Amino acid sequence: MSRPSRLLICAATALLLASPALAAGYVAELDPTPFDATNRADVIESIGNLTATLEGSTLTVQGTFSNFTSPATGGSFRIGLAKGVPGDAIGALTVEHARQGSFSGTIKLNTAQMAALKKEALYIRIDSEKAPDGNVQGWLEDSGKDHVS
């Protein structure tokens, strides 16, 4: 291979490595968890929203919640069998201990969790003192927007 060809290949490789990576964007609206007559008043007015980015296999979320009747106590990344089907916790969130506030978290997803994200089976749940099994929850949906990182 000639010297100019090698230089061209090296320059092209350096340019590709220096290019910004695209991160996939996700959103979710947090709605009250399923309720019955015993906990309806504790969750019915609660709302929230979030944005998330996926860089490689690392999912990062940031969001807010409001209208809780008691302070939030925690939150989690969760995986269900499909969108709308509740499932198990796969990671923890940092949640403000308040009736309205913010939350955030980062999790490294494995292959099965990445597949679940693509089929919208990953969701976020925020718990509170009066609703320890979930005050609000929302399934992650592709925002249709990629972000430069």
Model regions and ranges:
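Metal-centered catalytic cores of metalloenzymes
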Residues: S2, P20-G75, I79-S149
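Bacterial N-terminal signal peptides that target proteins for export
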Residues: M1-C10
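N-terminal signal peptide c-region/cleavage motif recognized by signal peptidases
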Residues: T13, A18-P20
